[in-house]
Amino acid sequence: MIGDILLFGTLLMNAGAVLNFKLKKKDTQGFGEESREPSTGDNIREFLLSLRYFRIFIALWNIFMMFCMIVLFGS
């Protein structure tokens, strides 16, 4: 059960890290305009942009997960 959850999280993180969409940051508000709360789409966009910077750590996590799948979760 825990192996399935770890595998699901790893695959989801990999999918987010390798997306090649042209995600642009939201334009800043001009002077005198009211600032509003970021929408859910803005939060998802920021999360996907931050995942791109952690690709090396995601690769190390993948190697660790492969090791765990062979040693701990293998039957």
Curated annotation (Swiss-Prot):
Residues in the Extracellular compartment per record: 18-53
One GO term describing the cellular component: membrane
Keyword set includes Heme: no
Cytoplasmic topological intervals: 75
Family from the record: Belongs to the SMIM7 family.
Record keywords: Membrane, Signal, Transmembrane, Transmembrane helix
InterPro entries registered for this protein in UniProt: SMIM7
Topology in the lipid bilayer: Single-pass type I membrane protein
Signal sequence range: 1-17
Source organism superkingdom: Eukaryota
Location in the cell: Membrane
Annotated protein name in UniProt: Small integral membrane protein 7
Transmembrane annotation, as ranges: 54-74
Database matches in PANTHER family: SMALL INTEGRAL MEMBRANE PROTEIN 7
